[in-house]
Amino acid sequence: IKGAETAKDTASLTYSKTNVQVENVDEADIIKNDGKYIYTASSNSENKISIYKPDGKKAKLMSQIEYNNVDDDENEAFISDIYIYNNSLIAQSYSYDENSWEYTNIDIYSLADIKKPKKIYSFSQQGSYVSSRITNGKLLVVSNRYISSDLCKTDEDYLPKTKINSDEKSLSPKDICIVNDSNSESFLIISEIDILSKENTVVSKAIAGAGTNIYCNENNLYIANSIWDDKNQAHRLKDISPILKFNTEIYKIDITSGIKFTAKATVSGAVNNQFSMDEYAGDFRIATTASDEKSNDINKLYAVSYTHLR
């Protein structure tokens, strides 16, 4: 039957992909599928990446990457998630250096020989991994780097650091943004890696602040962080049953040409996750949850115009 053959042919060409929030913006996952091979990242005791080729009811193991992307065996890197892009495997991991600083790591492997993936590029930035996205041939990586006076022995230790193929350097002060009303004790580090260029050129910048969730489209990156509203501290100290009040800070970054911090806003309530945020018709929309005087949850929805972001 001709129709049945067409359906069969169509089915053979389909395969599952990562469920992403925004079209043309890829998100990392522990399992990826490119239609030919299945890639898995094991973050448990195995700590490795495996590549399989589906073969009927079975899957043939093609190769594995035993994961440890730091020179010192005592400071092992632990896999977070992966991407498959432009015939390359991009692995994201975290590790700690000899001074206990946490790093977010990016390793790019060529898949030209699927049986022998070859590492062609390594990049690290200080801080705990928040999230990442791929859009327009660029990998965006976000991390939180807390400022620890115990670990900072010199003035330069306070500056965020990045590392390309083991060559470490501090961010220039001109690449660090501090908002006027900021009293943050941490830095948000945002890096953009051109994964289509042979050099894998990277741009890194930082802003005084922190983040827990991100929303990204092809033009803008938003980073949200729910914080305790310390303006209510005196009220809470007098109240036997204090009501915890939270605000959410939103940082907007233009990613159309490099990384450009453009605005900051604050709304009432705490944001749940990335799916509580989006951009529509020129406005940034965010849903938060707050509490009233009786500790009842109140859901709030904000549409923030760009002109109001400061």
Give the ranges of each region predicted by the language model.
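Hydrophobic or amphipathic alpha-helical targeting/insertion segments
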Residues: 80-156
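A short beta-strand motif characteristic of beta-propeller blades
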Residues: 17-21, 61-71, 120-121, 201-205, ...
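Conserved small/polar residues in nucleotide/adenosyl-binding loops
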Residues: 307-308
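Repeated scaffold domains used in trafficking and secretory/extracellular systems
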Residues: 76-81, 127-131, 210-213, 272-276
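Beta-strand-rich domains and repeat architectures in extracellular enzymes and scaffolds
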Residues: 10-47
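Predominantly five- to eight-bladed beta-propeller fold
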Residues: 151-191, 234-247
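Beta-propeller domains
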Residues: 40-66, 243-245
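Short glycine/acidic-enriched loop and turn motifs that connect beta-strands
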Residues: 45-46, 96-99, 146-149, 228-231, ...
